[in-house]
Regions:
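Compositionally biased intrinsically disordered regions enriched in Thr/Gly
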Residues: 2-236
Length: 236
């Protein structure tokens, strides 16, 4: 699928805007605080022939379903932990560590024009142990078609984007090799469904915690700046 961005120097505002929904709750063994985005059409475009309301509905449903699936997965673990904790406490005089399972989700709209939107969701879970885990989920859409964009879509047809991106990341890693795993645990190349998001000046490739670097490094990110990679990218 070809992405029709439009010239970034002559950008066009999208026909939709992003509202935020917050849900939160605290109980004995589980708490969550979640803010997730909801796309809405500007009033003047609600009945415009060019824009399909179903596209917005489908995008919102996909994002909401992902958020609830993440929350409910941790909630299910919290229920199981509560049962184990209660059973142990009733059978022993010993003290057991009691803690809450936690979910925090927030988001940032990093790009929103030229019929393209990019939203980065930061998801955190704590399920016991030394620390919680943080995940990034990026939602990149063509708002005219409803298609969820892949990294390949960002590049012109015929461009070997995998080679370009892999070489760039390898160069960045070589600049600070002490920050990354080596050998079999290190970076071997981007995946077919490589996560990324778009911001105002580039395309950000990212990896999960522990994927190519130690936990203390955080989520590794590598930005292909528009002004450096423009000749490869899929602009009109």
């Amino acid at each position: 699928m070809i992405v029709k961005w439009g010239d970034i120097l002559d950008s066009r505002a999208n026909y939709s805007y992003v509202a935020q929904v917050n849900i939160c709750k605290t109980s004995e063994f589980f708490k969550y605080n979640i803010t997730y985005p909801v796309l809405k059409l500007y009033d003047k475009y609600v009945y415009h022939d060019m824009y399909d309301r179903e596209i917005i509905i489908n995008i919102n449903n996909e994002i909401c379903e992902d958020v609830m699936e993440f929350k409910n997965s941790v909630k299910k673990q919290a229920i199981a932990y509560k049962k184990r904790y209660t059973e142990k406490l009733s059978k022993s005089d010993e003290d057991y560590v009691k803690y809450q399972y936690e979910v925090y989700i927030n988001n940032e709209v990093t790009y929103d024009r030229n019929n393209i939107i990019s939203i980065v969701m930061t998801k955190y879970e704590f399920t016991g142990g030394a620390h919680g885990m943080t995940y990034l989920d990026a939602y990149n859409y063509n708002l005219l078609t409803g298609d969820r964009l892949t990294l390949k879509d960002m590049f012109k047809p015929g461009v070997d984007y995998e080679e370009i991106v892999n070489n760039f990341i390898k160069e960045e890693i070589n600049n600070k090799p002490e920050n990354y795993f080596k050998g079999d645990e290190g970076f071997k190349g981007i995946s077919e469904n490589q996560p990324f998001y778009i911001d105002e000046d580039g395309i950000v490739i990212y990896f999960g915690l522990y994927e190519i670097a130690p936990y203390y490094i955080g989520i590794p990110k590598f930005k292909l700046k528009f002004d450096e990679f423009n000749k490869y990218l899929n602009y009109n």
